[in-house]
């Protein structure tokens, strides 16, 4: 079986799929067209760059039912009654227009709050227009890429709003990148400008010899805080010493760029819904990161899908006039980017920005200041918060929605959260390549399901084997997604695009799972994280969920290690809550709940587990 599995994989990788995306091109006279990896739309004698194409309505990217047999969409029978099966993007234009509309409609409302300072929609409008004008004055034109390297501070939404309104493309950069990682992303994207917080400017300085970015704008933590900003900068630089010495010749200060831009005229740029909006880099935890090309349609579709989904909760629990989102996940990550920033602006909500969510006491102090209604997060964050005594004392009555994503939500964590807050965690699923939300549990549910829910409106999910054949209900295979939120492809990587997106438009997620008879999908694990014990598939998530039930364990991570008899065995890394917990205690606990081949053969205790900046556990580092 293992040999057959390897051979079919090799055969599949040798196939060439020149047709990467299929959709109906809705322009007058348009027909069946194909999106190729160079960004051109080709079909029926027309050749246009995606960045030059205007459509009167959204191309149904990835929804090409005509390219494959009709699906039995069994999930529709489980849909909330008020949620339509399909979304209407006929009036969608661009993200910049969405932001402009929000600024007009919600002028005096706070859009973002950080460290006690409100940024109203009027402020967002004026500042982003000024920065957009400045970028245009530096010679940046439609389609140019601008990198953004900042945590959750007020300058972030100003910057991405300016970029998008100027018809440019946002390249989100993890501020904790090393010089090597930063060089790769800037060079790969061909960024013409970089906006960076001074805390990370030293990394940029170390990269200068290997990059060519003509415009570098440097922000400070206190830029948007008036006189208080001087005190903030003093504390950050001198007291906490969070700003290493740096020197970037020719850089421009963020405040100076804003001031200069206000004196210039901003020229609105016509942007089509199929134009690029984001290069969202992904895959950095598994190899060289690559840019997922997300169009304005991709993001707007996901905003529309999630808004329809969230309306169910508002219908059941009410919707306050001024809605507050907790924004603890980094905005450069696709989850917070769409669910917090984009949906928040569409709804006229306030996002409470948390620059450093790992500082749990400071995080909780911010939560004490405001009623919070929408709380996106991930398993490790929820777990860490519930171990804080002051968090337990917060007023949770206003909480309408808790949205879990980014990694599997463990049932013990979900049950404890519901008991503590009175609000269950609604788990969803997605990736950078799907903008990100592909599926979610219904928001009128009253308890945690342990699944990733139902496909979003206008979205199809199938389970396929290594040969690309659909699996029957209940059978494990790779989760594949098709819908208007699925990316155009990987930037300058046609081979990887053709491997990831099948001819019928389905995107291979790399996650293993199955669909039940009601259309709910359950993830069993990442394909690459699967452990093979004597020919049996073992999924780390299952072992970690069992370990999470032990009162003496804070968190754990399961990996496979070589074994001469069984090929691999399970090793469990554990962070203890109970200092007296022993290896035998853990093994005995697991033995009562797991069949023999799934049980950990080794247990190693750690003070902490390696994680990404978003909080995902890095199993790869533990394996290495």
How should each PLM-predicted stretch be described?
Residues 87-91, 100, 108-153, 157-161, ...:
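Conserved AMP-binding/adenylate-forming core of the ANL superfamily
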């Amino acid at each position: 079986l293992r040999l057959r599995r390897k051979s079919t994989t090799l055969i599949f990788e040798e196939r060439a799929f020149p047709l990467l995306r299929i959709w109906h091109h809705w322009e007058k006279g348009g027909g069946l067209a194909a999106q190729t990896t160079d960004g051109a739309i080709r079909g029926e004698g027309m050749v246009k760059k995606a960045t030059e194409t205007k459509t009167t309505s959204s191309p149904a990217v990835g929804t090409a039912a005509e390219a494959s047999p009709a699906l039995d969409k069994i999930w529709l029978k489980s849909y909330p009654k008020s949620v339509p099966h399909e979304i209407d993007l006929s009036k969608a234009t661009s993200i910049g227009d969405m932001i402009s509309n929000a600024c007009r409609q919600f002028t005096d409302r706070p859009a973002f709050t950080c460290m006690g300072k409100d940024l109203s929609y009027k402020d967002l409008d004026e500042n982003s227009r000024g920065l957009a004008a400045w970028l245009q004055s530096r010679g940046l034109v439609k389609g140019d890429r601008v990198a953004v390297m900042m945590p959750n501070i007020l300058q972030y939404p100003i910057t991405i709003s300016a970029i998008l309104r100027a018809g440019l493309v946002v390249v989100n950069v993890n501020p904790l990148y090393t010089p090597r990682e930063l060089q790769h992303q800037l060079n790969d994207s061909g960024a013409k400008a970089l906006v960076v917080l001074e805390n990370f400017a030293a990394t940029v300085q170390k990269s200068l010899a290997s990059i060519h970015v003509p415009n570098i704008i440097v922000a400070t933590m206190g830029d948007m805080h008036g006189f208080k900003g001087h005190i903030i900068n003093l504390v950050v630089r001198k007291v906490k010493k969070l700003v290493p010495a740096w020197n970037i010749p020719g850089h421009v200060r963020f405040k100076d760029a804003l001031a200069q831009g206000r004196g210039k005229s901003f020229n609105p740029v016509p942007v089509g819904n199929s134009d690029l909006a984001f290069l969202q880099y992904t895959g950095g935890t598994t190899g060289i990161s690559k840019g997922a090309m997300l169009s304005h349609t991709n993001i707007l579709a996901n905003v529309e899908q999630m808004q329809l989904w969230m309306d169910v909760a508002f219908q059941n629990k009410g919707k306050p006039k001024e809605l507050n989102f907790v924004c603890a996940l980094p905005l450069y990550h696709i989850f917070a980017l769409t669910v917090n920033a984009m949906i928040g602006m569409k709804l006229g909500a306030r996002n409470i920005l948390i620059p450093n969510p790992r500082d749990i006491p400071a995080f909780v102090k911010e939560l004490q200041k405001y009623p919070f209604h929408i709380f996106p997060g991930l398993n490790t964050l929820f777990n860490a918060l519930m171990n804080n005594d002051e968090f337990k004392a917060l007023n949770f009555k206003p909480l309408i929605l808790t949205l879990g994503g980014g990694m599997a939500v463990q049932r013990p964590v979900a049950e404890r959260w519901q008991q503590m807050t009175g609000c269950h965690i609604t788990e969803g699923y997605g990736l950078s390549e799907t903008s990100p939300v592909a599926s979610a549990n219904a928001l009128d549910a009253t308890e945690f399901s342990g699944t990733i829910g139902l496909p979003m409106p206008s979205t199809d999910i199938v389970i396929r084997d290594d040969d690309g054949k659909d699996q029957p209900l209940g059978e494990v295979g790779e989760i594949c997604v098709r819908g208007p939120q699925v990316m155009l492809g990987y930037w300058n990587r046609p081979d990887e695009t053709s491997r990831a997106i099948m001819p019928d438009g389905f995107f291979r997620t790399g996650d293993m799972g199955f669909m039940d008879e009601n259309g709910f999908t359950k993830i069993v694990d990442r394909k690459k994280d699967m452990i093979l014990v004597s020919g049996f598939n073992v999924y780390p998530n299952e072992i970690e969920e069992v370990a999470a039930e032990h009162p003496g364990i804070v968190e754990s991570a399961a990996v496979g290690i070589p074994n001469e008899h069984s090929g691999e065995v399970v090793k469990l890394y554990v962070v203890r809550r109970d200092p007296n917990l022993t290896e035998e205690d853990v093994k005995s606990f697991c033995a009562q709940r797991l069949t023999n081949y799934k049980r950990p053969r080794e247990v190693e205790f750690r003070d902490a587990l390696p994680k990404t900046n978003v909080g995902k556990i890095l199993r790869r580092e533990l394996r290495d």
